[in-house]
A protein has these predicted regions:
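Catalytic domains that recognize anionic headgroups
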Residues: 1-301
Length: 301
C-alpha cells in the first residue's frame, strides 16, 4: 500500500495562535499525541512561515492565495477568488466552521464558496454590535473568561466533573459537532475547513488538560490573576509567565483532543483512508521572547 494513497477529500484544520514548538512533532517536551500521530503518518514542514502575525494578515493567503494588501488597503477576501469557490464550482462539497473568530466571517468574505458556513459569532440584532464583533474577534471569549469562576463553582455544586463549562467557552464543541454532522452526511469529494480558537488568548482550558500538561495545582484564581495582569498591561513576573505558558499548552492539548474526535468521525464514516488532513496555525504566540505577550502587531525580524 502506498504511504500516500490518492485521496478524494481534504480536511483543513487551522488553529489560531498555534506555535510550532507547542506541538510534540517540533518539540518532544510537548504533549499533543493526536497532532504527533498526524505528523508521524504524514509530512512535517520544518520551515513553513505564516504570511502575517495576525489572523487578518495570514488568512487571505491561506483561503484565497492572496497576500494581504497586495492590491488594496483592505483585509479580508471580499475582492478575491476564494479557494472554496473554486472547489464548489468544480462539484466538490464545501463546509466551513469557525469557532467565533470575528475576522473569519461573512463580513470579511470568508463565507464565499462554502455551501455550509457557520462562524458561531453571536448576533444580538444590533448592526453596531455586529460591526464591533467583526473588528474585535475575541470579545466573546473575554466575556466567557470573566464568568469562568461562576461556571466552575456551579459545576462543583452540581458535582459535575466533566469540565463541560470550560470546554464550551471556546465554541470548540460547536465546531466539532457541526464538522461531525457534515462528515456523517458528506458525499465525496468534499473540502471541510475547521478553525479552532482555544489557543488564542484568553487561554481557558478545561482543568483536565491542565492536569495533563502540568503537575502543579492551577485554580481559577490563578488563571484570572495571570490574564488580568497581562490584560491591564502590568508587569508580568516569571511565575505569571509560566502560568500563561501552562494554560496555553493545556489549550493546545484541548484542541489536540478535539482533532482526535474528528479523526474518529472520519473512521466511523469510512472516510479516513480517502481523506487528507492538513493542520496549520495562522500565526504564533509570544511569551515575551520579543518584549510582548500574545501576538502584538509588530515584526521583529
Amino acid at each position: 500500500m502506498d504511504r500516500f494513497p490518492d485521496v478524494s477529500n481534504v480536511v483543513l484544520l487551522t488553529v489560531d495562535s498555534l506555535r510550532a514548538d507547542a506541538v510534540g512533532a517540533y518539540d518532544e517536551r510537548r504533549h499533543t499525541p493526536v497532532m504527533d500521530s498526524l505528523a508521524a503518518d504524514g509530512t512535517v514542514f520544518d520551515r513553513a512561515f505564516a504570511t502575517g502575525n495576525w489572523t487578518p494578515f495570514s488568512f487571505p493567503t491561506m483561503l484565497s492565495a492572496r497576500p494581504v494588501f497586495a492590491d488594496t488597503n483592505r483585509i479580508g477576501i471580499t475582492e478575491s477568488r476564494a479557494l472554496a469557490s473554486v472547489l464548489s464550482e468544480a462539484g466538490i462539497a464545501t463546509a466551513g466552521f469557525n469557532a467565533a473568530n470575528g475576522f473569519l466571517t461573512s463580513h470579511w468574505g470568508y463565507d464565499a464558496g462554502f455551501q455550509e458556513f457557520e462562524p458561531f459569532v453571536a448576533s444580538v440584532g444590533s448592526s453596531i454590535y455586529s460591526r464591533y464583533l467583526a473588528t474585535h474577534p475575541t470579545v466573546e471569549a473575554w466575556v466567557q473568561f470573566a464568568t469562568s469562576p461562576l461556571r466552575r463553582a456551579g459545576s462543583w455544586l452540581r458535582r459535575n466533573t466533566d469540565d463541560r463549562p470550560f470546554l464550551d467557552t471556546s465554541r470548540m464543541f460547536d465546531v466539532e459537532h457541526a464538522a461531525t454532522s457534515f462528515l456523517e452526511a458528506a458525499d465525496a469529494p468534499f473540502f471541510l475547513w475547521v478553525h479552532y480558537m482555544d489557543a488564542h488568548t484568553p487561554y481557558v482550558p478545561a482543568p483536565r488538560y491542565i492536569r495533563e500538561v502540568s503537575s502543579n495545582f492551577f485554580g481559577t484564581h490563578r488563571m484570572l490573576h495571570a490574564h488580568l495582569r497581562t490584560g491591564l498591561g502590568w508587569d508580568v513576573d516569571e511565575r505569571t509567565l509560566n502560568e500563561l505558558r501552562t494554560l496555553y499548552a493545556a489549550a493546545v492539548r484541548q484542541v489536540d483532543a478535539s482533532i482526535g474526535r474528528l479523526r474518529e468521525a472520519l473512521e466511523a464514516n469510512g472516510l479516513a483512508e480517502e481523506t487528507a488532513i492538513i493542520l496549520a496555525g495562522d500565526h504564533g504566540e509570544e511569551f515575551q521572547e520579543h518584549g510582548h505577550l500574545a501576538h502584538y502587531p509588530k515584526l521583529y525580524d
